[in-house]
Every structure is written in C-alpha cells, then in structure tokens.
Amino acid sequence: MKKFITTAAVLFAVASFTAAQDAVQPAASLKPARAAETERVVVIGGAIEQSETDKAQSVTILNENTLKQKAAPTLGDTLSSEPGVAGSGFTPGASRPVIRGQADNRIRVLNNGTEVFDVSNLSPDHAPSVSALLSQSIEVVRGPATILFGSGAIGGVVNVADNVIPVEQPPTALSGEVDGRFDSADLERSGAIALTFSPAKHWVFHAEASVLRTDDRDVPGFALNERIRAGLTPAQSQGRGFGQNPEGTVPNTYVRTKDYAIGASYVWDKGYVGASFSEFLSVYGVPDNPEVDDPTVPPNRVRLDVDKRQVNARSSVVDPFPWFTTANAKFVYTDYKHDEIDGDEIGATFKTNGVDSRLELVQKPIGFLEGSIGGQFFYKELSVLGDEAFLQPSQTTEIAAFVFEELKLNKVRLQFGARIEHQAIHIDNSDPDLTSLISPDQQDQNFLPISGAAGVLYDFAEGWQLAVNGTYSQRAPTAEELFARGPHDATFQFIIGNPNLSEEKNVGVDVSLRRSAGVVTGSISGFYNRYDSFIDFTPTGLVEDGLQVFVYTPKAAEFYGAEARADFHLLPLTLTKMRDQEANDPKSVKNVVTGDRSEPQKNPNDLFLRLQGDYVHATDLDTGDPLPRITPLRYSASLNYETEKWNASIECQRVAEQDRIAPFETSTPGYTFLNASIGYKFRVGATYNYVYVKGTNLTNEEARDHLSFLKEVLPLAGRGVAAGFRTTF
C-alpha cells in the first residue's frame, strides 16, 4: 500500500504541474502542436475508426517508426517499455505481453484483428507466432476488451497490424521497404523486405519476408542466482557447462525465426477484397535448471521447433446495405504445430488448427448516435501428443454477437456495448495412449459468458479530456485449465486442471486524465478490477517426478494500480513568421515567441523530458496473500530531442524490488538500466532512409525479471549496442 500511495502522489504531482503550466501559457501555445503523437487511428477498436483519445479505454499505439527501434525477437519484449505492459520473459525466444499484471488466457493476441492461433497462452515457454519486424503498428488495449474480442480479452488486447493484404491503391506501381539490424548483446542479426506491386488499376499484390537469428544471451555475471549457486558442489561451481555454473553467457538461449507472406487485393472506390498466405517458423532454446535435472549428468538441450501456416481473407465495403455505412468481414484459418525436443527426442508435440471469422456492420448515424453490430464464429482443435503429453485432444467452439454504440453530446461522448457468446469444449477420451490423463470429473463443458461496458469521454477544456470506463466481463475457462493433467518438462512443472471451474467474473473501472496540447502532454490512468472465480495457476509446494506441481484454482482476487506518461516540452511549441511590413519594425520583438501581429507556425524541433511509470497491486482475497508474478513498480525518465531529420534520447529506467510475493515465490531485486539512442533520416534519390544506434543496459547491471518462471537461471541481457537501418521507396 505504501508503494501505491507513493506512486499515486507522484502521478498526482505530475497532473497538478500540468494544470499549473496550462494556466500560464499564452493562448497560441495551446494549439495541439503534438497532436500527431496522440491522434493515431485505433484499428482494433471496432469497425469505426477511432483515435486513442476517442476511446474510453486506455489504449496505446506504437507506430511504424517507433517499432523499428523497439522491435525485439519476441512480442513481449517489444512492448515491455510501454506503461502498463511487460513481458513474461521466459526465454529470449518466448516472451508474451503482460498487461496490468494479467497474462496468458486473459490477454488476447491478434493479427489484424483476428486470432493468432498458437499455444502461447497455454504455457510461458510457448512464443507468440507473430513478428514485429514488418508490422505497421502494434495496438494495446489495457483493461477488459471482451465486448469486441471475447472472453479471452478480459485483461486486454494486443493487435499486430501489417500490410500483407493491401486495403487501398498505392500511388506508384512499385513500392517497398528493406530493414536490417544488429545487436551485440546476443549477436542478433535480423533483416526484412516488403514489396507492394500494382500492375493495373484495382489490383495490388504484396510480398514480404523477415529473418532473425541470435546466439546465446550475454549476461554480466553468473546465469544462476546466489541461492542456486550456494547449493552447488565445489566441482560444479567451477564448471561452465550445462547443469553447472555458466558465467557471461547463458547456454541454449538462441533464437532462429523466419517468416514470409504473400497477399493480393482487388481495390475499388467503395472498398476492397483480399487474401493472403503466411508461414512462421521458429526454433529457440530453453536454458537448463540444475535443480530439476541430475547435476551429475549433462542434460539434454531442450528446444522448441515452431511451424505455423495461415490463410487470411478480408473485405471492407462502403454502403453495402440500407441502414449501414460499412461492412467489414474477416476470416482466418490456421494450422500450427510445435515440437518440444529434449536432446534428440521429441518429448511433446502441440498441434492446433482452427477458424476465426467475424462480420461487423457500421450503422448510419441516428441523430447523435452511431455504432456497430457484429458477430463472430471461432473454432479450435488442440492436441498434445508424446511422452510429456498433459492434455487430451479437445475442440472449442465459440459463437458470439456484440454491439457497440456511441452517443455524441457536444463535449461529452457516451460509449456502451454488450456481448454474449456461447462456448462449448469437447474433450476426446478415445485415445488409449492418453487414458492416464482422464480425470474422474471429466466431461464436455458449455459456458455462456456475458459482458457489458459503459464509458464517458468529457472534453472539458481545450486539449484536456477525462475518460471513465466501467466494465462487467466474464471469461470461460479453457480446455487446459479444465482438463490438463501431466508433466511439462520445458517449464519444469506438473500441471493439474480443474474440471469444476466456472466462468471468471470481473467488475472493473478505468479512469484516465489526458492532455493532448500545450507544454505538458500525456495521460494518467488508474484502474480497479475485482474478480470472482479468478482462475489462478497456483503452486502447491508438492513435487511429482521431480517437477513442481501447479493446480488451476478458483479464487476471489483484486487488481488495482496506475500508469502515467508525461512529456514536458522544453522548446516553444510555435515559432513566428513575421509579416513583410513588420520585418523591419523594432516594435515587433514579440515575434520571437508569439504575438498579435505574428503568424504562429509549428516548431519543427522538439526537446522534451518524458516521465513515466506504472504500478500494479494484486491480491488473493480468499487468503490475503499476493498473487504470483506481478509486475513490480517501474518508472523512468528520459530526455528526448527530435527534428525533421534527427532524433536522440537518453533514458534512466528503474524497476523496483518485488518483495510482495505469493506463497512458494521468491522476491526479486530491483535494478536500474541506462539506455540511449540516436537516429537520422535522409533521402537518396527516390529512397527514404533511416539509420539508428541504440544502447541498452549501458552500465552492464545484473538484473532478473520477476515475471519469469526462469528468473533464477536466466538473467536479463547485459550491455548491448544495436545498429539498424530502414529504407523505403
């Protein structure tokens, strides 16, 4: 509670300073000189295009330029510096987004608004099968988003948007992009190329490919933490191999990823229809845990080999039917498989395939009311095969209908929506090799999650906005939460499901204060979520076959916290261009800033101090204990300089110690990172180019991620310097 009070006081001080600055600024400085940073379009927010400031929910969008510097081998690491978002950090090849302390089955990862279809929600060692290297943007909804995207979005949504299916006619017959990057921390070598070709009117084709390779992760000291090293024998302590005491590099943490996609569209003045095919391939290692394996025997190297193939089809049509302005249709079919390989043997094979389809219709405005209605059909088959299988084959079917409406009343906008879905889970008991996995209470399950939300946006002054959003959400349990029973060696866990689980029920509220113009811009948000029947992956303290036993357990839980980002612009937001007749008038000295006889123009240079932070407090209300793997208090300060050609920044990032821990969990020390970057834009002929250099953890500090199941054997990366380029034409 003391941390929360301290954080709230700091965030309140930032908001108070913002208000004070607003009171003393001249009128001309109130123009939204930085509006381009906050008015980016939200793609996942439904069929109606809206900006970040048009949503009652807390939304963050990373645009293409930002992603070029932030892109990492995993989606979780790419987003981990955003307020309210962290990465699960299991390995360099597997890190899933964690939003406000919630992860896995409560965070829905999408690609262009449809299901990614992998098994990254099933276990932390499974990587999201989507790459950020060629994405156009990544959009994050912090908090429940079940209205549009189902019960799996009860904690939030991450959508990776790309241009594989073109949606408009390009201005030239051929355009493209080439990217490259090198990072010294793990010897990352990555590259990407994308081409868009329009041979004739209406027809547009797109092709792209990317590849990423890293070696084992470099770390400042020992891979194992002090607690594990204290239990090693003297001979083991001197060793530097697997199962002993690696120093400087963590063995078996390499990543090999490549993906490609081709797409085509027919585009006309009232819409488009298109399709695409893509494949994602990845191989990555999992570091050894000497507390699980026999330290006298060199362990086999565990690695995961991922192969996903996907077919997409999308269309958008203007004025398709009476009463509707737009119809958006999406369809995706996916075939996914990965092998978990222990040495030369396949211990388990995970397979999933399925369909996600949705139709959204935007209604014509009725007075001040506008909105959309839609439906969704989702089907997924999941199987886990092999000696380490812990789940019988299952089929999950979801059918849903939803509505979202907005009522505009001058400075106030009211938003509300609802969703109802039916979910059926069928478990297949016919495989004689998997009879040991059958639970006595096992049977097919049916659920009927219902969700509703209401929000208000109040533009109470120029550049100021207050947003309040309330939600009631339900989430149906997944097949693995209900029926899992067996070992999972990659995570060193023995997993037991609970067939008696019911729907999670969540009541939440989110309040945001936003400032989009003036000397200080940014936002501050606070949230509260109360769960009944919260499905927790709970350690029992028991050991089965050398593995820690975890059980899916329902409980009452609450999450609350805050996040903020504030930019203090240190240069004038506007410059003045004098009128010709005043050019020689000595009385026109006011034109240095702004004045009645001058013409204000946006200052192309921006020097700003950015302060940001976030805090999450999560409690098991049945016992009063903290929930496990909750993001610690984080805050940072950076000085940034941007011009039309240059951008540079230096940042100090602090992650506090996490000592508010669940039973059978250990505390994690805090750490401080010093980061810096510089980039330059230039044009050569018909090409536009961007080059950059970025340094992370420049002081080479040892750090461990509290959210990672492997934090005791896998530190965060040491000092790294990355260099990259992007060329478009």
What do these predicted ranges mean?
Residues 251-257, 270-327, 333-354, 387-395, ...:
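Flexible loop and strand-edge segments within Gram-negative outer membrane beta-barrel domains
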Residues 474, 530-532, 582-596, 603, ...:
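C-terminal beta-signal and adjacent terminal beta-strands/loops
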Residues 184-213, 225-283, 305-319, 365-369, ...:
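Transmembrane beta-barrel wall of Gram-negative outer-membrane proteins
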Residues 76-118:
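Extracytoplasmic beta-strand/coil segments of soluble accessory domains associated
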Residues 24, 369-371, 521-531, 550-658, ...:
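Gram-negative outer-membrane beta-barrel transporters
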Residues 115-144:
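Short acidic/polar hinge/loop motifs at secondary-structure boundaries
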Residues 23-68, 76, 104:
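Short, acidic, small-residue-rich periplasmic hinge/interaction motif at the N-terminus
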Residues 292, 299-314, 318-320, 441-459, ...:
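Outer-membrane beta-barrel signature, preferentially recognizing the C-terminal barrel domain
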